[in-house]
A protein has these predicted regions:
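Charged, amphipathic alpha-helical regulatory modules used
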Residues: 25-124
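Terminal peptide-recognition signature
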Residues: 64, 225, 261, 281, ...
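Soluble non-cytosolic domains of exported or imported proteins
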Residues: 32-37, 54-59, 63, 103-107, ...
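Cleft-lining beta-strand/loop regions that shape enzyme active-site pockets
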Residues: 23-26, 31, 48-56, 213-218, ...
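Hydrophobic membrane-insertion alpha-helices, especially the h-region
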Residues: 7-19
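Extended, domain-scale alpha-helical bundle/helix-rich regions
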Residues: 130-252, 256
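Single conserved hydrophobic/aromatic residue that forms the stacking wall/gate
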Residues: 407-416
Length: 416
């Protein structure tokens, strides 16, 4: 048990060191050698600091190749058989490329994948314009591990038609069941109307999917590639780009500085999906679920910046900020009204992160139950609340109530 825990923490340290080393190198985002330098730094850190360094050889190369292809197209929705044949020439060469900071393989996969995704985005709408005939029996292979890649673009389009038909059939069956239950309320829809609704739902979902994909930058794909390299050392070691490191810190500490709202993007609009209890927005009742943020300013005098065409992460960066500072949001309310809202940022705690205790009573005893949803710590300030100190407080609190015993529940997917 000690070795498992020790290995976990060493891996976590390596992950943070990789982030630190890379994030403290100064280079512009458009510098052509940036990615090569990242490969060089990551391989150096892993070789010198990892507790169990690996030999980067042909076996290592094969694993990186297989994992990367699986990571970018696990369901074989985009790449063609000819693409895989082209990529396979590098299957035994990735180790050499890592050692020489060469990224030819990544460049080839990235450019090819972008092209294939664009092709699918072009033809999926064409498929969904035509009603599906659910009276015609067809077969589709969903065993992705044993599924062959499409021979060509026409073959891929046929595969997509079957997959979309299956999705539409699933939606059709669900909607028809609801429809049949509403017969008494005279809300019955025809089968053709239900089929149209099913295709429309799929279209909306795919628009969101391709919108998200269009916002992915080269660095996002390169992070995937780097992580297929570092996870060969052990499953707990990972490369964190600066943006991912910020999210990691937020998740591991259970808090962040901002307005206290969760956002999502749909149809080029940034919408409030949740107001976080205890945050500035919640305390002053400033925003509601469904409100749309159209622009952001950092002062009352500043011209608001339109955010509809931004990546969601970039828009979020404009909205978040240090405790005590103000942000001015142009908001379209659910009722259609538009107004500018001033919000003073603060520290927002995610209550679902932290340890909590409760009492359970039966006829003879009172029991204490402590629930720890996840491990948490603030790496910037170890004096702040963390899982260990909070558990101690909860135990002492339960002891003061003279419970019969305490029991700690842990998430089953976390290592302890």
């Amino acid at each position: 048990m000690f070795l498992r825990i020790f290995g976990f923490f060493i891996s976590a340290i390596v992950s943070l060191v990789i982030y630190y080393e890379v994030s403290n190198v100064n280079f512009s985002s458009d510098e052509p050698n940036k990615d090569k330098l990242l490969v060089d730094l990551v391989s150096y850190v892993l070789d010198k600091l990892h507790y169990d360094p690996k030999v980067i050889n042909d076996d290592f190369s094969i694993k990186v190749y297989d994992d990367f292809i699986d990571a970018v197209d696990s369901q074989k929705r985009f790449l063609l058989k000819s693409d895989i044949e082209l990529f396979s020439q590098y299957r035994l060469l990735i180790d050499n490329q890592i050692n020489s900071s060469d990224i030819t393989f990544f460049n080839l996969v990235h450019e090819t994948l972008k092209t294939r995704i664009d092709e699918v985005e072009y033809f999926y709408e064409e498929i969904l314009e035509v009603p599906f005939n659910f009276q015609v029996n067809e077969e589709i292979n969903l065993d992705y591990d044993n599924l062959e890649y499409a021979e060509n673009s026409n073959d891929l389009k046929k595969i997509w038609r079957k997959r979309l038909k299956l999705s539409a059939l699933d939606g059709y069956a669900s909607k028809k069941e609801i429809n049949d239950e509403e017969k008494e309320n005279d809300k019955l829809s025809s089968d053709s109307e239900i089929e149209i609704e099913s295709r429309s739902s799929i279209s909306d979902n795919l628009k969101d999917f391709f919108q998200f994909n269009s916002e992915l930058e080269r660095s996002d794909w390169f992070s995937i590639y780097l992580n297929t390299i570092v996870t060969q050392f052990d499953p707990h070691t990972s490369y964190l780009a600066p943006e991912a490191k910020e999210v990691f810190d937020q998740n591991i500490s259970g808090k962040f500085q901002g307005i206290g709202a969760r956002l999502f993007k749909r149809n080029q609009q940034v919408e409030i999906s949740e107001v976080i209890i205890g945050g500035p927005v919640w305390r002053d009742n400033l925003l509601n679920v469904g409100d749309i943020i159209t622009a952001v300013a950092q002062s009352i005098e500043e011209e608001p910046t339109e955010i509809s065409l931004m990546k969601l992460s970039d828009a979020t960066d404009l909205i978040k900020g240090e405790k005590g500072t103000n942000v001015y949001l142009t908001v379209k309310r659910v009722d259609g009204g538009i107004e500018q809202v001033q919000i003073t940022r603060d520290i927002v705690e995610l209550a679902e992160t932290y340890a909590k205790s409760s009492l359970i009573k039966d006829a003879a005893n009172t029991y204490g139950l402590i629930n720890l949803p996840r491990f948490y710590v603030d790496f910037d300030d170890y004096g702040e609340r963390n899982a260990a100190s909070d558990i101690k407080k909860e135990i002492l609190g339960l002891k003061s109530k003279a419970v019969s015993y305490t029991h700690l529940t842990l998430p089953t997917m976390l290592m302890v």
